[in-house]
Swiss-Prot record:
Residues bearing the modification N6-(pyridoxal phosphate)lysine: 194
Gene: phnW2
Protein name: 2-aminoethylphosphonate--pyruvate transaminase 2
Gene3D superfamilies membership: Aspartate Aminotransferase, domain 1, Type I PLP-dependent aspartate aminotransferase-like (Major domain)
Record keywords, A-Z: Aminotransferase, Pyridoxal phosphate, Pyruvate, Transferase
Cofactor needs: pyridoxal 5'-phosphate
InterPro entries with a match to the protein in the record: Aminotrans_V_dom (IPR000192), NH2EtPonate_pyrv_transaminase (IPR012703), PyrdxlP-dep_Trfase (IPR015424), PyrdxlP-dep_Trfase_major (IPR015421), PyrdxlP-dep_Trfase_small (IPR015422), SP_NH2Trfase/AEP_transaminase (IPR024169)
Single GO molecular function: 2-aminoethylphosphonate-pyruvate transaminase activity
Species this protein is from: Burkholderia lata (strain ATCC 17760 / DSM 23089 / LMG 22485 / NCIMB 9086 / R18194 / 383)
Entry keyword Cell wall biogenesis/degradation: no
Length: 376
């Protein structure tokens, strides 16, 4: 199936990929072959370059979804007697908190509503009040609603108090600036199937080398031991266990295209244009964004569901899908919403086309009142 014949995925990942990326998966690789090891080495180096971490940090890839790498990072980088502070403003923050509980790491949360970003002053107060906290685990872009948390300011607070910072950058890495030279962090976690526009199945942790060196024996798991994974890769250039060879090759191809496009500035700029086109188009239809624009990431946008008795998300989803676009359900606890992603490999006509498909779907469903405010 050609790219033109496929639906456009307006989701936070998996997302629409290029023909070049998918073509990279047509070749089979031996997992211990020197050519494949060279791909892994090149990929690790390029991922480090995106955050300017060469010389100070190490990139440790890991099989599985991004959550595998989040759990591996918490389990490896936080000692078993460590204490993790999790600022919580959404579903993916809550997932980190659950990981801490499952792994038996002491946990403290700062809880916010889903339409607020993390306040660095709250982190400051929590660290000042409790010297037993050893780590802060922050979600950079909380994909539940699309909130962009102030990473740089929080990193400065954490560094000031001499604690370690672990950043879940799943939905920001490669599109929103993270610079290891100016934003101190112990680890940044991301994955293949997000803003780098690879396919899902591979996560990676970019960790400060001096931090990794102190992590032997921390992990609860053999397969998720980042320290052991890193040491083995450094010694042999190979993966400890069978890697997802096709996914690695696809991500290598995707990162090559990322570099050719112009790197972070170009990728982030494209997503920002998609975001503006989406907001303008949906406002014209009467939809209300869930978030204040000041805290909205240009990655995924949450909209209030239509306030109309004819609206049903399942039918809405299927009708938009028939018109060539895949949306995403809301992930909020108390408000009925749906989400539209701004990321993926598609042209500038993609977002206006999606807005037109949504408008056509509303007409087909007989939805006349998109929001209470619009009707008033």
């Amino acid at each position: 199936m050609t790219l033109a014949a496929q639906p456009i995925l307006l989701t936070p990942g998996p997302l629409t990929t290029s023909d070049t990326t998918r073509d990279a998966m047509l070749r089979d690789w031996g997992s211990w072959d020197s050519d494949f090891n060279a791909i892994t080495a090149r990929l690790r180096e390029r991922l480090l370059q995106i955050v300017h971490g060469e010389g100070t940090h190490e990139c440790v890839p890991l099989q599985g979804s991004g959550t595998f790498s989040v759990e591996a990072a918490i389990g490896t980088l936080v000692p078993r007697d460590g204490h993790v502070l999790v600022p919580n403003n959404g579903a993916y923050c809550q997932r980190i908190a659950k990981i801490c509980r499952v792994l038996g790491r002491q946990l403290t949360t700062i809880d916010y509503s889903e339409d607020r970003r993390v306040d660095p002053a709250d982190v400051e107060r929590a660290l000042a009040a409790d010297p037993t906290i050893t780590h802060v685990a922050l979600v950079h872009c909380e994909t539940g609603a699309g909130v962009l948390n102030p990473l740089h300011d929080i990193a400065q607070v954490v560094a000031k108090h001499g604690r370690a910072l672990i950043v879940d950058a799943m939905s920001s890495f490669g599109a929103i600036d993270i610079d290891a030279r100016t934003t101190p962090f112990d680890a940044v976690i991301a994955a293949s199937g997000k803003c780098l526009e690879g396919v899902p199945g591979l996560g990676f942790v970019i960790a400060k080398r001096s931090t990794l060196e102190r992590c032997e024996g921390n992990s609860h798991s053999l397969a998720m031991d980042l320290y052991d994974q890193w040491v083995y890769m450094q010694r042999t250039t190979q993966w400890r266990f069978t890697p997802p060879t096709h996914v690695v090759a696809a991500l290598d191809a995707a990162v090559g295209q990322y570099v050719d496009e112009g790197g972070l500035a170009a990728r982030g700029g494209r997503y920002q244009r998609n975001y503006r086109a989406l907001i303008d188009g949906m406002l014209a239809l009467g939809f209300r964004p869930f978030l204040d624009p000041a805290i909205q990431a240009p990655i995924i946008v949450t909209f209030h569901a239509p306030d109309d008795p004819n609206y049903d998300f399942k039918r809405f989803y299927q009708e938009v899908k028939k018109r060539g676009y895949i949306l995403y359900p809301g992930k909020l606890t108390e408000v009925e919403t749906f989400r539209v992603g701004c990321i993926g490999h598609f042209g500038e006509a993609g977002i206006p086309g999606a807005v037109a498909a949504i408008a056509d779907t509303l007409r087909a469903m007989g939805v006349r009142r998109v929001s209470a405010e619009a009707a008033a």
